[in-house]
Structures are given as structure tokens and as C-alpha cells.
A protein has these predicted regions:
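Helix-centric, low-specificity signal for extended rod-like, repetitive segments
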Residues: 13, 63-64, 184
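Bacterial Sec-dependent N-terminal signal peptides
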Residues: 1-24
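N-terminal low-complexity, Pro/Thr/Ser-rich intrinsically disordered segments
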Residues: 24-60
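Acidic/histidine-rich, surface-exposed loop or edge segments in extracytoplasmic proteins
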Residues: 39-52, 99-107, 157-161
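A well-ordered secondary-structure block
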Residues: 124-223
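Calcium-binding acidic motifs and repeat modules
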Residues: 51, 223-224
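Short, well-ordered surface patches within globular domains
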Residues: 52-153, 197
């Protein structure tokens, strides 16, 4: 089980979704059961990816549920989101309703492959932000914006980035659900990135601030051909 105090999520998406949005929500600590990660298709796919064994346990968990949600969007709604809403009923509302519509109408999506450039990019940004004790942002402490970082790591075509901040024991699955809900985010940019059929590659990094709070970065890219 896990306890969640605060989640802050931000998004910056190139090509399709331009601009920034952010939302901060504070929750009373509540215990939530952690579902088993036992989908063989997702596990086999993930474990075959180059760079997978370099991920931390939290990063592997986040990667699992991201790909599970793309392979089984309807099941993700029923088996993951709904049980969470029972614990946090304050999450009910228009965003939950639209998420249900989106997850039940979307067809099965391609599972994300790990990309070395995106892994390095996500890890570098998460590390730079936390080591500098900087506020969660898509702009690095040295002033580099997402577009610059994307290009500097040898990536091209379209791409995007989701970031999330969690205080206390920030659970990867909870952070993902909050990104999907996109409460107070008018353009639903996080959700659109996660369900974007053009995005086929990802890189994930979760780093800790000195106070133990977590900063998550997930970068995306289209085909690099």
C-alpha cells in the first residue's frame, strides 16, 4: 500500500500540443492496495527492451502501467482507476468522466519501446532538477527548454514530455493515474501524450530530492526514421 500527500503534474508537448499546464492537488493520506503486475504480454515486451535493467524498481513499475494502459485501456479504467476513485472520491468529476470515455473508445495502442536518447534525456533532466533543489519544471536549471534538450540528445521529429512531483511516498501508479485524470489541466495534455498513437518511444526517470520527495520525468518521441 502507499500514502500520497501531494501530486504536482506538468506537461509540455511539442508539435501537437504546445504550451505548459500544471495542477497541484493535496490529499489526505489513505492506504491503497497495489495491484499485481502480471500481464505477460507487457512484462515480456518491457523486459526485452534495451535499457530496461537499468531502470529502478519505481521506474519499472511506472513503465509497466504506462504500457498496460495502452494495451488494455478499458481494463485500466475498470481495474485501476475505479478502485482508486473509491479511496479518493474527491477525484470524481468531469475529468474522470472524460477519461472513461477516452479509455473506452481508444483502440489498442502500440506499446512504448525504450529509447536510449530519451532515457538519457529524462535522467539528465530529473537529476538536474533534484540536485539543484529546483522547482519542478520543463526548463533545466541551466535554462535549457524542452526543445533544446530534445535536439541536444539527438532526437528529431515530434516529441513531448510529462513531469510529475509527489511528496511523501509518491507511488508511480498513483502518479500515472493523476496524469491521466489531468484535473485542472484544460488541454488534457498529459493524457493526450500517454494516448498519442504517434509516440512510439519513451524514456522514464524518477529522482529524489534531498527531502525525499519524488520528481518523475517521462519523455516521448515519434519514429526517429
Amino acid at each position: 500500500m502507499f500514502h500520497v500527500k501531494q501530486i504536482l503534474s506538468l506537461t509540455f508537448l511539442l508539435i501537437v500540443f504546445l504550451g505548459k499546464s500544471q495542477s497541484a492537488l493535496v490529499f489526505k493520506e489513505s492506504p491503497v492496495l497495489s495491484p499485481a503486475m502480471d500481464d505477460k504480454v507487457v512484462l515480456t515486451w518491457n523486459e526485452q527492451q534495451g535499457g530496461y535493467n537499468k531502470l529502478s524498481s519505481s521506474e519499472k513499475e511506472f513503465y509497466y502501467w504506462v504500457n498496460y494502459s495502452r494495451l488494455h485501456p478499458g481494463d485500466f479504467m475498470e481495474k485501476i482507476v475505479r478502485p482508486l476513485i473509491k479511496v479518493y472520491p474527491q477525484l470524481k468529476g468531469g475529468n474522470l468522466n472524460s477519461l472513461e470515455t477516452d479509455l473506452k473508445s481508444v483502440t489498442e495502442l502500440t506499446l512504448f519501446s525504450l529509447n536510449d536518447g530519451l532515457l538519457s534525456m529524462a535522467g539528465s533532466h530529473a537529476g538536474n532538477i533534484t540536485s539543484a533543489n529546483a522547482q519542478p519544471s520543463h526548463v533545466s536549471p541551466n535554462g535549457e527548454a524542452f526543445e533544446e534538450r530534445f535536439k541536444n540528445f539527438g532526437l528529431k521529429n515530434c516529441g513531448g514530455e510529462n513531469i510529475s512531483y509527489g511528496s511523501g511516498e509518491a507511488n508511480p501508479l498513483f502518479m500515472l493515474v493523476m496524469l491521466y485524470l489531468d484535473i485542472n489541466v484544460s488541454n488534457l495534455g498529459h493524457r493526450k501524450a500517454l494516448l498519442n498513437p504517434q509516440y512510439v518511444y519513451t524514456g522514464i526517470s524518477i529522482k529524489k530530492y534531498k527531502n525525499g520527495n519524488a520528481f518523475l520525468v517521462e519523455d516521448f518521441a515519434c519514429s526517429q526514421k
